[in-house]
Design a protein with these regions (language model features):
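Bacterial N-terminal signal peptides
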Residues: 11-22
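Residues at the start of alpha-helices and the adjacent loop-to-helix junctions
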Residues: 7-8, 19, 45
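Bacterial N-terminal signal peptides that target proteins for export
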Residues: 2-12
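Sequence/structural signature of beta-propeller domains
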Residues: 26-346
Length: 346
């Protein structure tokens, strides 16, 4: 952790203005803060649940939810990194595990749902999930505070099929809401309707030019452009294989039709995190921890964010990227995913 004497909230407020006005034309001079970590002294604050954090979602009340793969929970934070609603009373959501999972839950991706679709039940009542989680054990679950403030509920369990979910996004097609989930083991993007029913046809999400041995990994929907990253699979098709030049990025519409190949290999290395910052696409590599920036339209490489010493920003085990109010928040599963960081770039 870089020592600071100025309160984090003050630093971030000033830095946000610089980020917004400068954008990536300021290729150097970026900085960051580790807001939370499970290791005392690594973050400004310590949260024992920040173990291999992946997905990041922004709520309607301007708080941030971070999914902790290693702890099987999601935690709510204020934008300055403090736990919400208070340090003494953090809001922690327990994620359910698949029936075939004999260990703990292992959530990865998350998306905020502001629609009236995607209902989940606590056994008595059914309400739209505000947060939708996907997990490596093939579980899709949803949370609504009016069902249970501290527990998500099962929506779909495909653990018995061998499904391994790494990412999730939502989209609208023909005035209906759909859920898109990257099944890394099966090597395709699954589509679910607004009632969590798997769509067998009609959403191909296919690219015949992706080499064998690669599978959909990360996914985000930016204004109807569904961006999917591809990573190399290991022999069991369970995890990614980090290696330089190993990765592809495609753009689909919400029907799952391929619009274009955006990026092929090059600087990619098991890419997962995605964000649009100042109109440019930021891509986070899990493989080498670096962030690469591309033209969001034609995929041309624009550079890598660097610090004041011209050193590329690099975060061991980099997972999620999420931009908000001039910041780019990130998560990382440091020390071979045994520990974690939730931080912010400015």
């Amino acid at each position: 952790m870089k020592p600071t004497t100025t309160p984090v909230r003050t630093i971030l407020f000033i830095a946000a203005a610089l980020f917004i006005t400068a954008g990536f034309s300021r290729a150097t001079g970026f900085d960051w803060e580790n807001l939370q970590s499970d290791i005392h002294g690594v973050g400004e604050l310590t949260d024992q649940n920040v173990v291999n954090p992946w997905g990041i979602a922004h709520s309607a009340s301007e708080t941030i939810f971070v999914v902790d793969n290693g702890a099987g929970v999601a935690t709510e934070y204020f934008e300055d990194g403090r736990t919400a609603p208070s340090f003494a009373n953090p809001h922690i959501i327990t994620i359910p595990r698949s029936v075939v999972n004999t260990e703990g839950a292992n959530p990865t991706g998350v998306v905020w749902n502001s629609t009236s679709s995607f209902g989940v039940s606590n056994g008595t009542s059914t309400l739209p999930a505000k947060l939708i989680f996907v997990s490596e054990d093939g579980m899709i679950s949803g949370w609504n505070p009016n069902l249970n403030n501290t527990h998500a509920f099962r929506a779909v369990d495909r653990g018995a099929t061998g499904a391994i979910y790494k990412g999730v996004a939502t989209g609208v097609t023909n005035s209906h809401n759909f859920l898109y989930v990257t099944n890394f083991h099966a090597g395709h993007v699954e589509t679910y309707n607004e009632n969590f029913v798997l769509q067998a046809t009609g959403f191909p999400f296919a690219d015949s030019n992706i080499p064998a041995g690669y599978a959909p990994f990360g996914i985000r929907n930016f204004n109807g452009n569904v961006i999917v990253t591809y990573a190399k699979q290991d022999a069991d098709r369970e995890d990614d294989v980090p290696c330089p030049g190993c990765g592809f990025i495609d753009v689909f519409n919400t029907h799952g039709q391929l619009l274009r190949r955006l990026v092929s290999q090059g600087h990619l290395n098991a890419p997962w995190g995605l964000e649009i910052a100042n109109g440019q696409l930021w891509v986070g590599n899990f493989g080498d921890g670096r962030i690469n920036v591309y033209d969001a339209g034609n995929g041309s490489f624009l550079g890598t964010p660097r610090d004041v010493f011209n050193i590329p920003l690099q975060f061991d085990g980099l997972w999620g990227l999420f931009g908000d109010d001039g910041f780019v928040y990130f998560t990382a599963g440091i020390a071979d995913e045994e520990h974690g960081i939730f931080g912010v770039i400015f």
